[in-house]
Amino acid sequence: MKKFSILVCLSCLCTSFSYAQVIDCDDPTSSSLKKICSDQFKDIRQKLDTQSMTAFLISDAPQRLLVDTHQLWLNRLQQCKSLACYQQQMDFRIDDLNFYTSLNQSLTQHYLKFEHGTIAKQPVHLQVHQLSKDKIKIEGNAYRSPNNRIETQTISFLAYTTPDQKQNITDNENNCHYQFNFQKAILSVKSESKACNRFVGVYRVYD
């Protein structure tokens, strides 16, 4: 029984390690991966691997969230057209992993926008934080091109509400009004304003 438990633990560690490897440089298949796998980025790749492994081992964030946000980030990284962009995106991912590792995720629900069963091509990540018994904070980002200036790479979302007023939400960043429909596995977001449609859609919950 003891040997079996050890084997199970080792299996879990190996699975986590395979997911935690940020970039596979054994056989880079694209020109962008070849740039990322160059010696110039060796130190930050190692830092990313370490931080990713730490997140998988000790974060209370759902592992599926770590996997899917990694893929989302990797897709964005491969859109980069400059070395500065690569560096910037890797720094951003380290910050994200630090967030998942250092903060209590048990009071936060994460949502990624999905289209046709996969993560949306124009990704959106919403987070619903239970700040207290009577206060909820909803924040998020709609991602744009990583080649934009830093201040235009994302569209921010920020709202505060209460548990009994979670359906009608006003985004303080853009003064947009939304109807949030929280269900067991998904979140549906609607708006009557076409100017606010960037956050409209169906989201998968990670818990």
Feature map (PLM): residue ranges:
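Mid-chain, structured segments of secreted extracytoplasmic proteins
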Residues: F56, P62-T101, Q165-N175
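Edge beta-strand at a domain terminus
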Residues: I150-D164, S191-D207
